[in-house]
Amino acid sequence: MIVCLEVLVIVLMRLAWYLAMVAVTVLALLPIEHLQMPVFDWWDKAQHALAFVVLTSWALLLWPHAAMRVALRMLAYGACLELAQRAVGWRFAEWADLVADAVGVVVAWGLVRWLRSQQSTSIESNSR
């Protein structure tokens, strides 16, 4: 019974992650009417990095044994978003956005590694 509940939680968390990915994709491709963008907008880059920290951290926790694949796929997802933005015509692609996405992936990687090291340290100290 407990195993079934754990599996259900994992399945629901993965479903929620996929829905979050769809939501980010939709938001990234929505037309932005009458938006005057500065040449380089730090807030936009911070939003990219934060979105990728959250999505990548979440994915790394859901698929702990596929960390490198998760990181590479998140980078590919960021590149695909930029290409899609270029293709739709009402958005535009920026290399700086892709760099911000990559920063988010790297920060997530480091954060999850640190959290796991803290968890293993805590388990070791509790077993003594």
Question: For each of these PLM feature ranges, what is it?
Answer:
Residues 1-60, 74:
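"…centered on the first transmembrane helix and the immediately adjacent amphipathic helix/loop
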Residues 1-7, 118-128:
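Membrane-interfacial, low-structure loops and terminal tails that flank and connect transmembrane helices
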Residues 11-15, 63-71, 94-95:
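Membrane-helix interface segments
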Residues 24-28, 74-82, 105, 109:
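Alpha-helical transmembrane segments of multi-pass membrane proteins
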Residues 30-31, 64, 89, 116:
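Short helix-capping/hinge motifs at transmembrane helix termini and TM-loop junctions
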Residues 34-42, 81-106:
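Interfacial helix-loop-helix junctions of multi-pass membrane proteins
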Residues 50-67, 105-116:
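Membrane-interfacial alpha-helical segments at the cytosolic side of multi-pass membrane proteins
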Residues 55, 62-85:
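Membrane-embedded catalytic cores of phosphoryl/pyrophosphoryl-handling enzymes
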